[in-house]
A protein has these predicted regions:
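Bacterial N-terminal signal peptides
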Residues: 7-17
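N-terminal intrinsically disordered, low-complexity segments enriched in P/E/S/T
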Residues: 24-170
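N-terminal secretory signal peptides that target proteins for export/translocation
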Residues: 1-4
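Sec/Tat signal peptide C-region and signal peptidase I cleavage site
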Residues: 19-23
Length: 170
């Protein structure tokens, strides 16, 4: 066995292990499965980094609750999660922009100077239950839509990424 074979197998195993877990069957009950990847570019102080977050790690961040309805749901719902700004502060990221990706490669770009930026919530539960993939989970970026008209625009709706699995900080 050559070293190239060992490197290829090691990379394949690491890719499998480091890939966020999106199995509908496990319904994200495993709090230690990776559900979100966050990449941060290199700075003068550090190299580029990729952070893997488990559901337990997200729940360890300050929790925020929004009671709101959405254009995709019929009733008032209670969304619990971590604000995007709190997640980025936890990894000392200072974004010029943020791109949020869904498992189907839908993406939305966030501008930190935009009004309402601080209210983007990475929701991990709705009405006290985890969200399976078939119900826009396991992670869904939501806003307090009915708190203010500024959250009821096509632009904000387009940033409401469900099935969130990756964030690229630029």
């Amino acid at each position: 066995m050559g070293w190239r074979f060992v490197v290829k197998i090691s990379f394949l195993i690491l890719s499998f292990v480091m890939t966020p877990a999106y199995s509908e069957e496990n319904n994200f009950g495993n709090q230690n499965a990776l559900v979100l990847e966050v990449s941060v570019p290199a700075t003068e102080e550090r190299t580029a980094l990729v952070f893997g977050f488990t559901m337990a790690m997200l729940k360890a961040l300050p929790e925020t609750v929004y009671k709101t309805s959405t254009v995709w749901t019929e009733e008032l719902n209670e969304f619990k999660g971590a604000r995007l700004v709190d997640l980025l502060a936890a990894i000392d990221a200072r974004p010029k922009s943020v791109i949020a990706w869904a498992i189907n490669d839908y993406m939305a770009e966030f501008d930190p100077t935009q009004e309402g930026w601080n209210e983007a919530l990475i929701a991990y539960s709705v009405n006290g239950k985890p969200m399976p993939v078939r119900e826009k989970g396991p992670l869904w970026i939501v806003f307090p839509y009915y708190e203010s008209p500024k959250f009821r625009s096509d632009y904000i709706y387009s940033q409401s990424v469900w099935q969130l699995n990756r964030i690229d900080v630029e």
